[in-house]
Amino acid sequence: VRESIELIQGASEPFSLERFLEGSQTPVFFGSGVNNFGVEDVLNALVNWAPTPQPRDAGKRMVEPDEAKFSGFVFKIQANMDPKHRDRIAFFRVCSGEYQPGMKVFHVREGKEMKIPNALTFMANDRVLMTNAVAGDIIGIYNHGQLHIGDTLTQGEKLQFTGIPNFAPELFRAARSKDPFKAKQLQKGLQELGEEGAIQVFTGEFGNILLGAVGQLQFEIVAQRLADEYKVDALYESTDVSTARWLSFPDDKTKREFEAEQNARLATDVNGNEVYLATSIYNLETTMKHWPQVQFHTTREMNQVF
């Protein structure tokens, strides 16, 4: 053990709280949750070192954590956390103000009010109803499809928190159900998994489904979840797509002309954004040169609509 510690000390840098707080260093802990070894060190470090809530960029302005009015954003959605109830939980970070049970908030993307009757917090498998939450707290909100990753909730102000990017995928598979009678279940499952951010889902003009990922493991996880949670066995086939780019146009005329010429290479993502599916980098570069007025985006903010 002593030799291992000396090796670790020689291969790593001393911990710097200043560098940790500026985001340039990550502490590493060694322990075992099963054996209850080192757990206290992690918890103590969290209490002693974790930064206080910071101001966050909300597009129009910076939101300070000590502001009186409630605001925050959805950063994760998890479906089927309780297999018995097939529920969906939206994980929400409070950025300012205070959550109170039953409060009404303004759903910025939808442009309407919604009520949060019972927010949750989690400890392992246990769920506890929240009596209040302040800036920096994470709450779970039961979600029936009205909340997406990146959604902002406020007390009336039209803000949009940023900082949850979606990257253009590097691997692609065409997906279809082994059982034709379960095509709708496959579509529903992939729609929900796409909204979670578990995988990127693109739909072609004729309803064909294309999955995009940054690593092979994503396909395997999605296949397993479709089988376990949605009872759908799917086929994942190779495709001629090499890379993808989100599109934005300067005007409707350019959009119509581009769509007419490139119709076979277009699809939409779960938020309805138009995507160009290139067969190769050469194909992408050629199209970009031919259409200099069209913007080809390698990233987009979660829930962003171009």
Which ranges hold each PLM region?
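Structural and coupling elements of P-loop NTPases
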Residues: 1-306
